[in-house]
UniProtKB/Swiss-Prot annotation:
Disulfide bonds: none annotated. The lineage of its organism: Eukaryota, Metazoa, Chordata, Craniata, Vertebrata. PANTHER family: PIH1 DOMAIN-CONTAINING PROTEIN 1, PROTEIN KINTOUN. InterPro entries: Kintoun, PIH1/Kintoun_subfamily, PIH1_N, PIH1D1/2/3_CS-like. Its main location: cytoplasm. Belongs to the PIH1 family. Kintoun subfamily. Residues 183-298, 399-467, 493-552 are annotated as: Disordered. Required for cytoplasmic pre-assembly of axonemal dyneins, thereby playing a central role in motility in cilia and flagella. Involved in pre-assembly of dynein arm complexes in the cytoplasm before intraflagellar transport loads them for the ciliary compartment. Residues 399-424, 535-550 have a biased composition (Basic and acidic residues). This is Protein kintoun. It is found in: Cytoplasm; Dynein axonemal particle. GO terms for biological process: axonemal dynein complex assembly; cilium-dependent cell motility; epithelial cilium movement involved in extracellular fluid movement. It comes from Danio rerio. Residues 208-290, 440-467 have a biased composition (Low complexity). Keywords: Cytoplasm.
Amino acid sequence: MDADRLAELQLTRAEMRRIGEALQDRRFRELLTEYVEEISSPENRRRYEEEIRRLEEERGAAVQFIHPTPHHVLKGRGPSGKCFINICSDQLIEKPRSEAATDDRGRSGHSWRIPYSLTPGRAGRDAAGAPCVLFDAVFHPDALLMAENNARFMTLIHRTATGGIQDNFRIRLEHVTRLKMMKYKGEPQPTMIRRPNPGQTEAADRGPQQTTGPQQPTGPQQPTDPQQPTDTQQPTDPQQTTGPQQTTGPQQTTGPHQPTDPQQTTGPQQPTDPQQPTGPHQPTDPQQTTDPPPTAPQYRLKYRSVLDLQDYRCCRDSGSAGRPTAIIIEVEVPRLRSAQEAELRVEERRLLLEAPTAEYRLELPLAYPVEEERAEAQFNHTHRLLTVTLPVLKRRRVEEEERRAEEEESRKGGDEDGELHPDCGPDPPMMELQTEDTHTPAADTHTPAADTHTPAADTHTPAAETGAGLGSGVALLSSSNVISVCGADVHQQLEEPGDPSAHTDPADTHPADTDPADTDPAHTDPADTDPADTDPAHTDPAHTDPEMESRIAGLHLQNTLCFQLD
């Protein structure tokens, strides 16, 4: 252990050699021994404390030295390693006091006020020689006496000591336990408590400002200050010398000049505030001290998931294993006394924690939507840790998504089926096609009035009439691409000859009856129309060309097959 302490000094070879040579000198050893006895002597320590006390009193502060009496030790773990808290007592600490009070539930009890003193952490070593940190918490002896007889009061003493160290030194202590076989860790050291002196102020006792106060010769001329000397005092205001001079006035001229001091302070301050730049800066200082901005506490974010083998199936309805079931947030709030001092708001995508008394504010966005109604919060008084558990909303079921997708597909499909061909109407059934294309004898029968006894007009080919009839039937079935193609084939087959004379029956054509004059509609005389001259071959339904009937039957069969295949 001594070798480790020597290594911490980081001495060079030259320094080690010089120390070795000095220790060989007898005179050096005598001086070193005398110095050790001097600093360890109680009388010298008392003299040293008295000198420090006088020096602080001259500066306007009352100093008290506390010599802690060991009682027991608490052991914990901090951010840098082991920590030991020495619970001590001293008569200079105030006694604990209690007052009758009621809690939020209306239960009556006592509210305790326990004064204590803390020392900053100092380096030390544990039993194994590892580095550690030592703290001292000093209470009044009556407080420790009550704690020995009451376990709840002892717990209150421990919480007060650990909470004060965490709040004042900004560290976190974990796993704090009591060591029963140890009263003090390390070497007891006196503690100095410095309080302001009631008779003086610290601002008036500063070095360069103490000399300016007594040197002013304006003491007896103070009643005339509000009229003339205000002009001479204004240039001294930017030098920040009027602040301590005004405070030293009532301290030095206590008796007769007290009624004139308020006039001096209120007189020059009111006209100089709007003129000099020192005025607007004065109200900003108390705002900065009274309203400090809240700090964001440290937190840890965790995601909790429940392992389920159903989530790993090769199915579309299996859940996603990467989505957590809950979000856990651990917030460190060492300055928070109880959970009632904090306000927690949970939204679907945001968490907000506000503690005005402890000056905490934390706004945290959430990666997953959570259920606000099922949120839980738990506060650990020992570790000053706030744990918030937020259940994550489950993902939408796959069945609902599939149903919605099917509805959208069916809606789109209905829109596409509703679009009709510009040349076609709605799709008729197959029976309507057969009845439409079936040529009755009455449809092909030419009335005598329409024949007008002209041989040229009698040359109406059955193919042209049949093509017109089939064209209308095909147009009714052109609701799809296949039927439209079939309809185009029908028209192409009907229009292939291109020469109307090719379908003219030689038996129906009379060359002798052909007259160029008769072919002109303008020269047609109604009187020339004779019912007896009507060709009986045109009015006979049985008089039909066999070749055209076979072609019409083939076209009917082709249209029927195209409709059934579609």
